[in-house]
């Protein structure tokens, strides 16, 4: 019961919500809270969000966040609870989402245990039947990891918004990395179910890529020029993105520009394969 009391104090959840979540008697939780020296208040109507924000997908921001939720959002199976937790390094991105839905509460710090180590993360959570039902209708369902399907393209008021959905999903379940020791060749990976990824790549400028299975996880991989093409497609002229991945994209843009300028300067000069001039795009380890 001590953990439930702590969650009541830390998250501002209602007693009714905690009773459903932990299958405990609401009165017993109330008594435990009072015994711990805290006041019991009616929180049922204190937490507010714009629960109709996804009723129509008609802006870049809505399409992007829907894609991100398909990757990292969590809709509960029974109690109409939504939760999204991100690593501490992405705290600002979660705050953007919190502002996007006009959440009346701030995001909360939580401790996550992984491989016997404890890490800081931040969580946005609330109860809203309409919000959760809308996500489920689009395909963002509970326990979606192994059953996720791509949404019907007709939910987007403009087909151009599908690209923003793709970017949102990539920011959540994709990565930008390298595939050689010198960190000079870009590689991007996108994880998901086979069914979802097959539909996802249909909207990319390069498709028909083979989906590989790595540690039981299906993924699409694009290397070198194809990886750069996909990044360009996803991020160019966009206004909302995960900042750290966008910075990696810009870093590769600068490096590829230098490479192209070098190659152009060598045209007609009898390019020396052993030239001492190199292009360094590592600037440390590139991974996201």
Q: What is each residue range found by the language model?
A:
Residues 1-288:
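Internal intein/HINT superfamily modules and their associated LAGLIDADG
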């Amino acid at each position: 019961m001590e953990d439930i009391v702590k969650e009541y104090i830390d998250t501002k959840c209602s007693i009714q919500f905690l009773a459903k979540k932990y299958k405990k008697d609401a009165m017993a939780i109330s008594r435990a809270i009072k015994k711990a020296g805290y006041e019991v208040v009616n929180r049922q109507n204190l937490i507010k969000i714009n629960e109709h924000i996804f009723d129509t997908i008609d802006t870049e921001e809505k399409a992007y966040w829907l894609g991100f939720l398909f990757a990292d959002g969590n809709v509960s199976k029974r109690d109409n609870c939504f939760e999204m937790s991100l690593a501490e390094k992405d705290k600002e991105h979660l705050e953007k989402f919190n502002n996007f839905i006009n959440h009346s509460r701030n995001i909360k710090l939580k401790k996550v245990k992984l491989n016997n180590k404890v890490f800081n993360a931040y969580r946005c959570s609330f109860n809203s039947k309409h919000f959760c039902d809308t996500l489920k209708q689009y395909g963002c369902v509970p326990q979606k990891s192994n059953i996720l399907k791509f949404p019907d393209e007709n939910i987007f008021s403009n087909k151009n918004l599908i690209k923003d959905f793709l970017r949102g999903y990539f920011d959540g379940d994709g990565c930008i990395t390298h595939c050689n020791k010198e960190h000079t060749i870009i590689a991007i990976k996108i994880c998901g179910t086979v069914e979802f990824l097959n539909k996802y790549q249909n909207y990319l400028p390069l498709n028909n890529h083979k989906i590989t299975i790595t540690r039981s996880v299906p993924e699409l991989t694009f290397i070198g020029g194809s990886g750069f093409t996909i990044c360009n497609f996803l991020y160019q002229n966009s206004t909302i993105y995960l900042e750290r991945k966008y910075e990696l994209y810009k870093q590769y843009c600068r490096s590829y520009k230098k490479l192209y300028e070098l190659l152009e300067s060598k045209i007609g000069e009898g390019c020396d394969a052993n030239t001492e001039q190199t292009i360094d795009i590592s600037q440390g380890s590139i991974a996201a």
